[in-house]
Amino acid sequence: MGELPFLSPEGARGPHINRGSLSSLEQGSVTGTEARHSLGVLHVSYSVSNRVGPWWNIKSCQQKWDRQILKDVSLYIESGQIMCILGSSGSGKTTLLDAISGRLRRTGTLEGEVFVNGCELRRDQFQDCFSYVLQSDVFLSSLTVRETLRYTAMLALCRSSADFYNKKVEAVMTELSLSHVADQMIGSYNFGGISSGERRRVSIAAQLLQDPKVMMLDEPTTGLDCMTANQIVLLLAELARRDRIVIVTIHQPRSELFQHFDKIAILTYGELVFCGTPEEMLGFFNNCGYPCPEHSNPFDFYMDLTSVDTQSREREIETYKRVQMLECAFKESDIYHKILENIERARYLKTLPTVPFKTKDPPGMFGKLGVLLRRVTRNLMRNKQAVIMRLVQNLIMGLFLIFYLLRVQNNTLKGAVQDRVGLLYQLVGATPYTGMLNAVNLFPMLRAVSDQESQDGLYHKWQMLLAYVLHVLPFSVIATVIFSSVCYWTLGLYPEVARFGYFSAALLAPHLIGEFLTLVLLGIVQNPNIVNSIVALLSISGLLIGSGFIRNIQEMPIPLKILGYFTFQKYCCEILVVNEFYGLNFTCGGSNTSMLNHPMCAITQGVQFIEKTCPGATSRFTANFLILYGFIPALVILGIVIFKVRDYLISR
């Protein structure tokens, strides 16, 4: 086979690329050099049980089949080296990274051991030892690069001065060539920001803040153009040279990247087909009778060679046999035995350094909550459209009511009672929706960020929830006061300042309850559209059962009457009815006494309507307020519990 241009002396990086065949453990015994950090993965296997049929097919749903995702994978890599894990979609690349980093869910069966500097790690130590950059870059879009990294540093590192955080962030940005975009916003699909390659660098920078010795990156070049992908790999290779272990998975690598990797591993259906240096890879496949053609991309050639072609049954059998032959050949090769020897030698070598845990001395619970609150507030305050809509969406609804009703009357023949009942019904029914719309629009991105950062150990998911709750409280109060101030006096409701205060307080509660109920459901259901539908259904049902406006509560079936006590609409409606109707006197047809016998003239005082619609509500006015506002902390506590459970389920 002719010499490949990227393995010639001019194209290679000198001794850096050739050191994989002789580990530093062996070098140390010869030259006496200081041993470096090492990562060993020994006989790792992972399988899950899947149901045969869909959940609605009871017979087939009860049957299960075991799926082997990883099978007897062993790797060895040292600091100063970068390893590339190749494989087609579904080959187990991401699962292998999850297994090494301790992020695999416990729903499957994991076997094997992971060693760092010869020490087997416990599950609770994985998070403190490895940094993991996911394939998707999830950030708060309205923060700048500098702010994003600074808040991450404040969450991850010990409490210190602002100068300490600034120096740390500036050093990392300089190392990753981000200084020129430090004050640019991250951006999103709604508005421009930094480029995809720069976003990927920010993801890497966020992990580097804790000085990790082992970094893993899942598909870091996916979605990037050729030049940017090459720059990212060069950057990672440079990071590896600075006494780090770097492992990346790549789906479709370019030939130019071949020379930058110290070790290359190839996975097929969860089995290791090869793991070694680029030179060892060329020699291994050449000895197996599959030399790489001159001027071909070794990545493409050997990925095609180790993939199973499922286009036809004959091709599938043929290619599967070839892959099995290559797997057996690798397990019998000196390269594989050298991997096992290095892992075993590291376990008993006493000169290796201790396990290199990340620099991690984070602030306490309330310190993290304060950082999250400041970060959430700064991010959401820059979203001008969201801020404006939060403040005026209730007011917009109120303006429609004003244009429709103009001003409520005291004449029962002109709809004095009916107009007030319709107004209160709309107010109690609409205010939870505005809260729900806010949460559905703003919280899913915060949830995505917290899902990722909580896996990095920066904080717990419920702390992000509580930070959002504290952030929305003042906005909700201001929005409700603006809405109430315009609607209450313009519509001509009971002209008393104290009544206006009760009115505003009564409408604030369902607005908050609607938003917090949405947050609770967002902790259970991933799709915001489904949450939207659930909240709408619950709000309509609660209003029908609890308000007493559609059907007299006393005439309801006992189960519905009992169910009404668990709806916040019952207490809110009783408060608003008493607040508006108590002490109110109605006229009927003016001075025309012939109209006094009209059925609509039966109600001449507001107290009559109160006793007819919600008997005893006047005496329960204070209790109703306490119960209504009791829903708010109850939902917050329920949300914290659910997000704690979510934290556990994602990490298990």
Swiss-Prot record:
- Give the protein's biological function: ABCG5 and ABCG8 form an obligate heterodimer that mediates Mg(2+)- and ATP-dependent sterol transport across the cell membrane. Plays an essential role in the selective transport of dietary plant sterols and cholesterol in and out of the enterocytes and in the selective sterol excretion by the liver into bile. Required for normal sterol homeostasis. The heterodimer with ABCG8 has ATPase activity.
Top-level EC class as recorded in UniProt: translocase
Q: Which residues are glycosylated?
A: 410, 585, 592
Gene (UniProt): Abcg5
Per the UniProt record, the associated disease is: A spontaneous mutation gives raise to thrombocytopenia and cardiomyopathy (trac), with recessive inheritance and fully penetrant phenotype. Mice are small, infertile, and have shortened lifespan.
Tissue pattern of expression reads: Detected in liver and jejunum. Detected on enterocyte villi (at protein level). Expressed in jejunum, ileum and, at lower level, in the liver.
Q: Where in the cell is it found?
A: Cell membrane; Apical cell membrane
Recorded catalytic activity of this chain's protein:
cholesterol(in) + ATP + H2O = cholesterol(out) + ADP + phosphate + H(+); sitosterol(in) + ATP + H2O = sitosterol(out) + ADP + phosphate + H(+)
Q: Where is the lipid attached (S-palmitoyl cysteine)?
A: 61
Cytoplasmic topological domain: 1-384, 444-468, 523-529, 646-652
Note the subunit structure: Heterodimer with ABCG8.
Membrane topology, Extracellular segments: 406-422, 491-501, 551-624
From the Swiss-Prot or TrEMBL record, give the protein name: ATP-binding cassette sub-family G member 5
Comment field on protein domains:
The Walker motif (consensus sequence G-X-X-G-X-G-K-[ST]-T) is expected to bind ATP. Within this motif, the conserved Lys is essential for transport activity mediated by the heterodimer with ABCG8.
